[in-house]
Amino acid sequence: MNQWLAWQISGLGPSQGQLVWFLAFHEGAHGEKPGPSIIARYQNEVERLRSVLETHLASAPGGYVALGHLTIADLAILPWLKLSALAGPALKPFDQYPAVDAYIKKLDALPEVQAAYKKAVPPPQ
């Protein structure tokens, strides 16, 4: 479980956060568009990380990242997967990652996750 929590906090979160920053906010904050190599760097890394997750989930017991059941690692990963919508077409749609897509749908359907969504401001799409 700790491995997947570390994967999110050191990989997916920072890489996707940087991608979204450069796509959505950099120009407004700095008055210039980011170079294409910057976008490509983070785009490629996020897609690589999604592939790692896809490979793992395809054979993970119970369809969760660790221990065969819901853990804090799943709850740390899910918001970043959901927030990838902010990157728009810069990232492949989740239907190209069927195990990740099923994982998102599975977690979204959990009563605990639904309860958290009701408290979110604004609610996630």
Language-model regions: role of each:
Residues 113-125:
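C-terminal helix/juxtamembrane-tail motif
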Residues 1:
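Hydrophobic, well-structured mid-protein blocks that either form specific transmembrane helices
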Residues 4, 8-106:
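GST-like fold's C-terminal all-alpha helical module
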